[in-house]
């Protein structure tokens, strides 16, 4: 893998973790949203990742020769199908006939834990990028001596 290939892999990781962080932020922001624009209760969203694929046959053959992957990409953002939390609040405008309001299936503690995980993964990718950049700079300096 070339130096630029290593930088590209790190960049894809940072982009993927940024999307994950954006999704987590959206979940936290909507923790008390009882209905969206369509009148439905907000559902927690999760980011799914997959390896970046090899677009050509020759690149696919390179995998058999020890070729390293091209990074990660977001395959999709899915809604969590689990039910929301029912809270008794008969004065709420979205309460049902029994006085219960359905709140989103978002757990703030879980989202904060996921946010820490996404931040650490992003930082790890930044560290790899900076290390790769440092190696490239040292290699250029060797040629100057």
Label every model-predicted segment:
Residues 1-145:
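Amphipathic alpha-helical polymerization modules
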């Amino acid at each position: 893998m070339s130096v630029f290939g290593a930088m590209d892999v790190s960049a894809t990781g940072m982009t993927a973790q940024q999307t994950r962080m954006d999704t987590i932020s959206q979940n936290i922001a909507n923790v008390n949203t009882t209905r969206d624009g369509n009148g439905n209760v907000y559902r927690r969203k999760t980011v799914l990742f997959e390896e970046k694929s090899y677009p050509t046959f020759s690149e696919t053959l390179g995998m058999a020769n020890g070729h390293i992957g091209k990074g990660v990409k977001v395959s999709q953002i899915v809604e969590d199908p689990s039910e929301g939390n029912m809270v008794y609040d008969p004065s709420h405008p979205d309460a049902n006939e029994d006085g219960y309001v359905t709140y989103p299936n978002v757990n703030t503690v879980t989202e904060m834990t996921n946010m820490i995980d996404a931040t650490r993964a992003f930082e790890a990718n930044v560290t790899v990028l900076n290390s790769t950049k440092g190696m490239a700079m040292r290699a250029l300096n060797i040629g100057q001596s």
